Amino acid sequence: MTNLPKVTIRDLAESGVHFGHKVSRWNAKMAPYIYGVHQQNRIHIIDLRKTLPLLEAAMKALYDVASQDGRILFVGTKFQALDIVASEAVRCGQYYVNDRWLGGMLTNWNTVSSSIKTLIQYEKILNDEDSILTKKELGNIEKKRKKLDKELGGIREMGAVPDILFIIDTNKEHIAVKEAKKLGIPVVGVLDTNSDPDDIAYPISGNDDSRKSIELYCKLAADSILAGIESSLTRSRVKDDELIQEKEGGIVQTKKKRMKDETEREVIVSK
C-alpha cells in the first residue's frame, strides 16, 4: 500500500494555495483550474477541488520515481523558495538548483559534470595543508570555488540527469522546462494562474509566490520521496532476507544476503 502523506483542501486553503495573480496577468490555459475572481482585489481564485487531485497525482509520481531509486531534482530560484527548496531536497536525499538555472544544465550534462569535477578539484587544493600556492592564489581559487558551489553545489552528487523535476514557478524556470521536454524528462510543476500548463506532465494548480504555499508543496514532495525510498528499502529487505541454505557437515546453516548500501540509505530515510 502506498504510504503517501495526507493533505486536505483545508490544508491547502490555510497555506493560501487558492490565491492566484491579478486578473490582468492570467493565462487562459489555466481557466479549467480557476474557481472565480475576488471582486475586491481583482485576483483569480484557484479551485482547490481541482488542485487536490492534481497534487495527489504529482506526489504519487515522485513517490514512484523514488521507490525505483530514481534521481529527483528540486528547482526553485525565486527568492521565496531558495532555502525551502534546498532544505527539503537535502532532507529527502535528493538534489536541487536554487541559485540560477544554467543553460544546458540538463542538455549539456557533460559540460556540467566537468564543472563539478573542477569544483571538487578546487576543494582538494584548498584543503591541501602542503600546498605551495600563495595566499593570493588560494584566495582566487576560493572565489571560483564559491561561485561554482553556489551554482552546482545542489547537484554535485547527482551523477547523471534526473529522472523527474519538481519545479516551483514554471514561468520563471521555463528554461528548465524546455530542457526537460527535449530530454523526455517529466516535470512536476506548481502552476499559478499566469502559467502555461503545456509540457508539464504533473501540474499542480496553486499559488507559486506565497512562502507558506511553497513550504507546503516542498514538504509534501520530500515526504512523498521519503515514503518511496522506504518502500524501496522494504523490498530490498525482503530480498535480503531470503534464506540461502547450505549443508555443511550435515548441519543446515542459514545465511542472509545484505545490500552494500542499505546503511547509507537508511540514514537518508531517517533524516
Curated annotation (Swiss-Prot):
GO aspect biological process, one term: translation
Keyword Iron: no
Keyword Ribosomal protein among record annotations: yes
Source species, domain of life: Bacteria
GO CC annotations, alphabetized: cytosolic small ribosomal subunit
GO function terms (MF aspect): structural constituent of ribosome
Keyword annotations: Ribonucleoprotein, Ribosomal protein
InterPro entries, per the entry: Ribosomal_uS2, Ribosomal_uS2_bac/mit/plastid, Ribosomal_uS2_CS, Ribosomal_uS2_flav_dom_sf
NCBIfam families in the cross-refs: rpsB_bact
Family, as annotated: Belongs to the universal ribosomal protein uS2 family.
UniProt protein name: Small ribosomal subunit protein uS2
Record gene name: rpsB
